[in-house]
Amino acid sequence: MNEPDEDMMAPVRRLARFMATLDDSNLEGVFAEDLTIVENFAPFLFRGDGAAQAWRAGFVEHAKTLGELVPEFGSAQDFSREDQTAYFVLPTRWSGKSRGRPFTELGGWSFILTR
């Protein structure tokens, strides 16, 4: 297998859907108990107890200047899997509005997923 399967992509898609809609129901079951998130908003590193809740609150604040977010995923890069753990980089194109002005952002997300 060279790509994440649909079970691996489901939480990624739900996370992106939360980011686009701020609908908390999309976050159910998305985050692992042992969680680390690196972000572009303070405090930039979210880990340990309460990381998911702190990231959510930070993102909601960050998203106040964003609108009409649409993610587009490319083919996964650097996919590897061992036992119940998988790693991959997911090229992502975000488009939408920032402070009312159209933007496009090209980047990538790195994921380590465990079953």
Question: Model-predicted segments: where are they?
Answer:
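Exposed beta-sheet edge and beta->alpha loop/turn motif
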Residues: 82-115
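A solvent-exposed, acidic/Ser-Thr-rich amphipathic alpha-helical stretch
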Residues: 24-84
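General structural signal for alpha-helix termini and helix-helix connectors
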Residues: 14, 37-40, 97
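Short, highly charged low-complexity linear segments
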Residues: 12-14, 70-77, 112-115
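Short, low-complexity N-terminal intrinsically disordered segments enriched in polar/charged residues
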Residues: 1-34
